[in-house]
Amino acid sequence: MLELKALLLTQGMHGMVSQVEGLARALGLTFKHRSIKLKPLWNLLPPKLTPISENLVKEKFDCDSKVIISCGRKSVIPSIALKKRLGKEIFTIHIQDPKVSLKHFDLIISPEHDNIKGDNVLTTKGAIHYLTKKEIKDNLNYLNVNKEKKKLVAFIIGGPNKYYNYNDQTIHQLFTKIKTLFTPDKYKIIIV
C-alpha cells in the first residue's frame, strides 16, 4: 500500500503543531515537521504584502511529500512557494485564515469564527486537534473527578506567545480570580 507523506509547516507554537499533526494523523499520513522562521524583514510583514519565494525562509528545506499542511501566518508564503514550484505534484492544506487569496491552497480548514467562505474552505466549530476517539475512549476515567456532583468548570489556558507571556505573579492572580469566582464548595475546577 502506498504511504503518503506530509510536510507540516508551522511557527512551532504548540497550538499550531497540535492542529497540523492532528490532521496528518487523522488522514493516516506519515509526516515530518518544519518550524518556519522567515528572514528578518519578511518576518515583520503580513503574508499579503510578502513576495512568494522560498528564499524568504531562514533555513532551506526539501519537500519530498505529496501533501503540505500549514498553519499560522509565517507558514503561508513557504507553502504557496512550494505549490508554485511543484504544482499538481503536491496538495496544499492550510489551517486557519491564511489572510491571502484562498485560491493559493487546495484546501483551507478554518474555524467558524474566522468567517471565511469559498469552494475550497472547510469550516470547523473550533480548532482541530490530535486526540482520537480511541484515545478519548481509552481514557474516559482520566477526568472522573466529579464524584461530589458539583458544577464542572474547565479552563484551557494556552502557552506563552508573542502577545502574552506568563510569570509567577500573573499565574497566581489568575488562579486567585478563578478560586474567588468559582468557590470550591459549589464548583469542581479543571485547569488544562
Kindly give the residue locations of the regions a language model identified.
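Extreme N-terminal starter segment of soluble prokaryotic enzymes
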Residues: L2-L7
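Active-site and donor-binding regions of nucleotide-sugar-utilizing enzymes
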Residues: L8-H129
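Glycine-rich phosphate-binding "P-loop"
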Residues: I36-P47, F155-Q169
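Glycine-rich beta-strand-to-loop/alpha-helix junction loops that act as flexible
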Residues: C71, I157-P160, V192
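A nucleotide-sugar donor-handling region in carbohydrate enzymes
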Residues: K103-N167
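Donor-nucleotide binding loops and adjacent catalytic segments primarily
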Residues: K149-K150, Y163-V192
